[in-house]
Amino acid sequence: MDKRRILKRDISYVAGDLFSEALFCKLYLPGVNSEKADVVMARVLDMQDEFIRRANRPDGKENKKRVKEYYCKLRADLQTEINAIATEIGELSK
């Protein structure tokens, strides 16, 4: 349970950082399209909800191997999504 709680906390921290970065780009950088920034911020919030929901309900709770594989895939998917959103935020300021 502790590891799941830590994972959910990490997801929230990363989502908060990404949201703050997108908000900063929207408010303080000249020439940033506000609508695109809003889309990125909505994507961050959706990502946070999706991954916390996935962390709450692993597949095959009785089989430890399946649970471990599930969380490994969850972490890999999370990292992929974080990288994609970070790239979008980077493109906002161009």
Where are these regions (language model features)?
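Low-complexity intrinsically disordered segments
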Residues: 42, 50-94
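Amphipathic alpha-helical interaction modules
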Residues: 25-57
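N-terminal acidic leader/helix
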Residues: 5-30
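Amphipathic, well-ordered alpha-helical segments in soluble domains
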Residues: 14-21, 47-50, 81
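Short, solvent-exposed segments of well-ordered alpha helices
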Residues: 1-13, 35-38, 65, 69-72, ...
